[in-house]
Amino acid sequence: YKMKAIKKLPLFVLALLFLVSCQAKPATDDTDSDVSIVEWERSDLYTDADIQAAMDAVMTYFETEFKGCTLTQLCYPGDASADLFTEWAEECEADEAIVLYSSFDTDASGGDGSLEPNTTYDDFQWILVRDNGGTWEVKTYGYG
C-alpha cells in the first residue's frame, strides 16, 4: 500500500504545481472586486493590453446584461485556441476575434429568469471581435 502511495506522490506534486501556476489575481476595478482574472501566458497574438481590453469589455457587458449574476472568474485560454479565434473572425466578418472563458453564479431568480437559479456556470465562452485593432465588441456568448 505504501509503494502505491509513493508512486502517486510525483503525480500529486505535479498536479499541485499546475494548480499553483494557475493562480488568480484580483481585478483592479473596485466594482468587479469579486472577479478573479486568471493569469495568462504571454501571447504572440495579442498584447496584454489587448487581452485586458477584451476582459474589460466582457465585465462591462456582464454588469449591464447579466443582472442577478456574479462574475467570479475570467480567463484567456492562450494562443493554442488561435484556430478558434480565426473561425470566429471569419464567421463574424471581422479582422480579429478572441475567445475568453468565465465562471459566474446566478442568484435565486436565475439572473433574468433564463438561467438556472442558484447555479454556477463554468467554462462559459465569450466571443469578441474587432476591426483594425479597434475596440473589442462582445459578439456572442454561451456554451460551445
Model-derived features with residue positions:
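A generic structural micro-environment signature
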Residues: 9, 77-80, 134
